[in-house]
Amino acid sequence: MTENIKDALSYAVELAGKENKIIRSETGKEYFDSNEYDLQELNPRKYAPILELQTLKSLVDYLKSDNDFISDRKIVVVVDSYQKVSVYDQVDFENGKRPQLVSVKATVPVIPFSNWRDQEEFNIMLQSMFINDADRNLVLDFASHLKIEKGAEVQDNGISQMATVRDGVASLAQAKTPNPVTLRPYRTFNEVEQPASQFVFRINKSANLALFEADGGKWKLEAVESIANYLKNELASNKKITILA
């Protein structure tokens, strides 16, 4: 009997202790002080999960729609990079947060720059991952006709290279590698023009080929600007949308 009374008293003390750990703020919110140092809000405000998209067109369609009453809200569209755009709601000052509504990430191929590839792999890469233009075709033609036999050497002065290429059906000739070349790989959203940038085209003694980026990343800034301009044009009628790049 004594033990039962003791257990009941201990339980009552424990309940009283827990009650004391619940703190109410001036705004009416309740917090639980689990260890006297870490306040955890009871029943915090819930936010909808971030909507994940892959194209700029889908983002424009969503922002023009009446889903989630999005067309009536003041929102901020941020071009985070050449492959990512984020949409934020107005600041929730009560909770100290800026809710993110949408995340758009471009689906682009992983292009193996600065890596040596044999002729077949290199040709496939050029045709499948680059816009069809003059310099791409020039590099493709050179790579397709390249021939380095055992004992042959690639002449290199550090800037350009001389290599043996097939000239006609059977004859061979020395040709200088095209350098530098201006190419447009698929690196950003398809709705905007793929930015052009310079590359150094190199060959090694095994007839492997590689492209090395040579513009210092300038193309990334151009891509961000193109994305921002696209969104500004498509969403010009909605004055509640702020676009930042």
What residues fall within each predicted segment?
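Charged, low-complexity surface segments at secondary-structure and domain boundaries
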Residues: 41-47, 107-111, 128, 212-217
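Generic detector of well-ordered alpha-helical segments enriched in charged/polar residues
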Residues: 6, 10, 57-60, 120-127, ...
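Membrane-inserting effector segments that mediate pore formation, membrane fusion
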Residues: 111-162
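An N-terminally focused, membrane-permeabilizing/fusogenic/translocator signature enriched
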Residues: 1-86, 237-245
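N-terminal start-of-chain detector that recognizes signal peptides
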Residues: 46-50, 153-158, 169-174
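Alpha-helix boundary/N-cap detector
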Residues: 3, 50-54, 113-117, 130, ...
